[in-house]
Regions:
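Glycine- and aromatic-enriched membrane alpha-helices
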Residues: 1-431
């Protein structure tokens, strides 16, 4: 085994920690958007995304995605890296790395980085199903979905599989598919899964007739800022080295996020006459989503343009749920689906040296379209099978009475805010 590059190792471990922070960030982002009677349940759904994913990744998820030999371009052998046996070994009673990846940091460090990606992908789905699903069903779904959807998708895109730069689709078209940090694997995948579950479990009581206002907009803003901060590890860490590409990714994601926040705000101002804090938070995230697959291959100008386009499109897309009648509670489809698809496709226009407007030809656009649609199809089919099976066996939803009374009390037996208890204590002190 060669010498460990301590700089790269430290950077990837730092990036893994930043990406891990994104799931608590999205917990606050979504937690502020729900009504007060459902905020604890949302935080618990995100906690399950962290915990269950970690267990599955340790057991066989890592092996399916990255450790095992390729099986049909779709997944790896789940046994070869079972319990991370390929990534660490005991020496004198202390576990250490068994090998190095291409940038000379231990495989175990890559395990840490990649599991954080799996966690946030699962965590994004929660927003669509807020306020009505059972915690127990969600935990089972996470275990199955990471196994049969996320891990194979990561293998297909990032480990030489069907949708990778060297995969069968890229070879057939004659252009290398590009997804730097998760336009397909994370955002399109999560959004499609969210939509499928929503269509199976149905709408919240009062959808379309009652206003579902966020109960804590400062939580939403805090979550958005934490997500932006975590995104530095999410994208800059995807350079897999402490190098210039990592530095440039930091710049491009911030440029896109800033542009999207502004363009979302301008769109809102035209439509409703206000620049809202909710819009600013959502716009930031939309820009971050759109630049994710392209952060290393678009110029600063195109990063700003991509962010601006994404801000407008995602803002408009969030209203589609009312037109088509699907209850995507917190706009996972509008922000992550439309944003992820937009970013993936715009590489075909703006990708340096390959995009139509950046010195390339039509092939890059074609391959980006194909991998996006294959990702949509795979996620839709796998999620539909899992979600439908759960619906027909243990069921997804709490009862209508529990939903109306508040899922926090029904599922967690707690309230986030004990206003009655506080008022009672104050009255006693006054007396």
């Amino acid at each position: 085994m060669g010498a460990i590059d301590s700089g790269n190792t430290a950077w990837i471990l730092t990036s893994a920690s930043l990406v891990f922070l994104m799931t608590p960030g999205v917990a606050f982002f979504y937690g502020g958007m729900v009504r007060a009677k459902a905020v604890l349940n949302m935080l618990m759904l995100e906690a399950a995304a962290l915990s269950v994913t970690m267990i599955i990744w340790t057991l066989w998820g890592w092996s399916i995605a990255y450790a095992g030999s390729d099986i049909g371009g779709i997944f790896g052998d789940p046994a070869s890296g079972f319990l991370l046996k390929d990534s660490m070994v005991a020496q004198d009673g202390v576990f250490t790395a068994t090998g190095l990846n291409g940038n000379n940091y231990p495989v175990s460090v890559d395990v840490a980085f990649q599991v954080a990606f799996a966690m946030i992908t699962v965590g994004l789905i929660c927003g669509a199903i807020a306020e009505r699903v059972k915690y127990s069903t969600w935990m089972i779904f996470v275990a199955l979905w990471v196994t049969f959807d996320y891990a194979p998708m990561a293998h297909m895109v990032w480990n030489g599989g069907l949708l990778s730069a060297g995969g069968a689709i890229s070879k057939a078209i004659g252009a290398a598919a590009h997804d730097f940090a998760g336009g397909t694997v994370v955002h399109i995948n999560a959004a499609v899964a969210a939509l499928i579950i929503v269509l199976i479990i149905g709408k919240r009581k009062g959808f379309g007739t009652q206003p579902f206002r966020p109960h804590n907009v400062p939580f939403v803003m805090l979550g958005a800022f934490l997500l932006w901060f975590g995104w530095f590890g999410f994208n800059a860490g995807s350079a897999f080295a402490a190098n210039g590409t990592a530095g440039y990714a930091w710049v491009s994601i911030s440029a896109a996020a800033a542009a999207a926040m502004l363009s979302w705000g301008f769109t809102e101002k035209i439509r409703s006459g206000h620049y809202t804090a909710m819009g600013a938070a959502s716009g930031m995230v939309a820009g971050l989503v759109a630049i994710t697959p392209a952060a290393d291959v678009v110029s600063p100008l195109w990063a700003i343009v991509m962010g601006a386009i994404a801000g407008v499109l995602t803002c408009l897309a969030c209203g589609l749920k009312f037109k088509f009648g699907y209850d995507d509670s917190l706009d996972v489809v509008g922000v992550h689906g439309v944003g992820g698809f937009t970013g993936t496709i715009l590489i075909g226009f703006f990708g340096e040296g390959t995009g139509l407007l950046a010195g390339g030809d039509w092939k890059q656009l074609v391959v980006q379209l194909v991998i996006a649609f294959v990702a949509i199809l795979y996620s839709a089919v796998i999620t539909a099978i899992i979600a439908f099976a759960l619906e027909k066996t243990i069921g997804w939803r709490v009862t209508e009475a529990q939903e109306v009374g508040g899922i926090d009390l029904a599922d967690q037996g707690e309230r986030a805010y004990d206003f009655a208890g506080t008022a009672s204590s104050v009255l006693k002190e006054v007396k």
